[in-house]
Amino acid sequence: ASFQZAPPGBAKAGEKIFKTKCAQCHTVDKGAGHKQGPNLNGLFGRQSGTTAGYSYSAANKNMAVQWGENTLYDYLLNPKKYIPGTKMVFPGLKKPQDRADLIAYLKZSTA
């Protein structure tokens, strides 16, 4: 299933998902710095593995995916399948609604 078929995302619900499943490793605010994972500010339109000051796996750099709604929707289903060799240990969000909500939140919070 593609992002086009996804339910409309709810950024408020996405914020809750981010806080419970993502915030232990990622920040979204400009200049917030990196944690175990990279800061996600400016995520949309950026190429994977290119955030300055973060040590990415070769897999992330070599994948050279452009992050957007479609790529994030697929990636967040199963990160290790989408980018084999990624350092991200998160197993993914199986529910289309959860992925759509998280993407809606990320669009607002990382812009």
Curated annotation (Swiss-Prot):
Cell compartments where the protein resides: Mitochondrion intermembrane space
Binding locations of heme c: 22, 25-26, 88
Pfam families reported in the protein's UniProt record: Cytochrom_C
Domain of life: Eukaryota
Positions where N-acetylalanine occurs in the chain: 1
Gene Ontology CC terms: mitochondrial intermembrane space
UniProt modified residues of type N6,N6,N6-trimethyllysine: 80, 94
Major site of localization recorded for this protein: mitochondrion
Annotated PROSITE patterns: CYTC (PS51007)
SUPFAM superfamilies attached to this UniProt entry: Cytochrome c
Post-translational modification comment from the UniProt entry: Binds 1 heme c group covalently per subunit.
Annotated keywords: Acetylation, Electron transport, Heme, Iron, Metal-binding, Methylation, Mitochondrion, Respiratory chain, Transport
MF terms in GO: electron transfer activity; heme binding; metal ion binding
Biological role stated in the UniProt entry: Electron carrier protein. The oxidized form of the cytochrome c heme group can accept an electron from the heme group of the cytochrome c1 subunit of cytochrome reductase. Cytochrome c then transfers this electron to the cytochrome oxidase complex, the final protein carrier in the mitochondrial electron-transport chain.
Family: Belongs to the cytochrome c family.
Designated name of the protein: Cytochrome c
